[in-house]
Amino acid sequence: MMREMRVVEKRQLLSAEEIGRTLQRLAHEIVEKSGGTNDLALVGIRRRGVPLSQRLAKTIRDSSGVNVPVGTLDITLYRDDLSTVGPQPVIHSNEIDFSVDDRDLVLVDDVLYTGRTIRAAMNGLFDLGRPKRIRLCVLIDRGHREMPIEASFVGRNVETSDTEIVEVRLKEIDGEERVVLEIGRAHV
């Protein structure tokens, strides 16, 4: 039996300005906890992790003068729910123009939820080589983990229920900038 979700309320969690300030803080944390930018590279998980990783790299460049490599990772083939994605999932290519071997990698995504996306991303990275270290940076951590995965860099922790949805909207993809919590009521 299929459950339908009806949105009862939308509550803004972050405005465009707050997203900008949060990304600045995260960029500084990444550099500080990495002991600088040596061997550092950012890898955005397609879709919304990509513009977030690019913005983090720009902030690092603006503050340190160092161009940190940025890559894009498509995890479609590594998902454990591929059969539920659809009969013909769209596969994009990875765009990682640097060796991941012995790199200090920071995976970047918009929302951390069950951890399954991150597990798939790590599998994809290990197929490309052997990084020195992999850490995770997320804009929102909403809890409800199904995997033993924890973010090293978190923009905001948000307590949610399983019926709520965290929607990240970024200007590069959505034409607007905000993070919203959709509070719904599941019914049959």
Task: Place the predicted regions along the sequence by residue.
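PRPP-associated nucleotide enzymes
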Residues: 1-186
